[in-house]
């Protein structure tokens, strides 16, 4: 991970040592309103069914989620200024107990259209690269000025995401 950070909250059965709940995120360097900051994509949320009601309402999912939020979200050094994710079955519980908000109704953002005919310039060449270098950093530096909010897609991030991915080798 380009941030060098791990963001995981666990619930463990102390009698057996078994992990019974997990709330994790992918920390990201984010460009927001002209400033580099940290954010987190929420991923891999799970609680074993027999443990979901543990501790009464709001249940173990919300308890582990609160621990994650209290630990990683804030304005302190190294904290994420926001988190985001895709809807999960526990979305309503997250909305009620963890402050999840529906930012966008994604099914309104797409429509199938035929691909337009595009002209091809003889001045451009498209090639495959093994690794990203300073040229992609220059591209990102030029592009970020047009963006209000985006994951920083510089060479460090793109190499981690694609070139260094285990499935590439």
Q: Can you name each region flagged by the protein language model?
A:
Residues 13-16, 50-51, 113-115:
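Short loop segments at secondary-structure junctions
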């Amino acid at each position: 991970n380009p941030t060098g950070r791990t963001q995981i909250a666990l619930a463990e059965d102390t009698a057996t040592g078994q992990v019974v709940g997990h709330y994790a995120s992918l920390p990201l360097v984010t460009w927001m309103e002209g400033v580099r900051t940290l954010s987190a994509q929420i991923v891999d949320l799970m609680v074993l069914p027999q443990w979901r009601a543990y501790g009464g309402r709001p249940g173990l999912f919300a308890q582990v989620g609160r621990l994650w939020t209290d630990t990683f979200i804030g304005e302190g050094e190294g904290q994420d200024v926001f988190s985001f994710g895709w809807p999960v079955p526990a979305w309503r519980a997250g909305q009620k107990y963890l402050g999840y908000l529906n930012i966008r109704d994604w099914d309104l953002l797409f429509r199938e259209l035929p691909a337009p005919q595009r002209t091809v310039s003889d001045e451009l060449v498209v090639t495959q690269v093994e690794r990203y270098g300073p040229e992609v950093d220059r591209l990102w530096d030029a592009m970020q000025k047009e963006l209000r909010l985006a994951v920083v897609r510089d060479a460090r991030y793109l190499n981690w995401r694609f070139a260094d991915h285990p499935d590439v080798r």
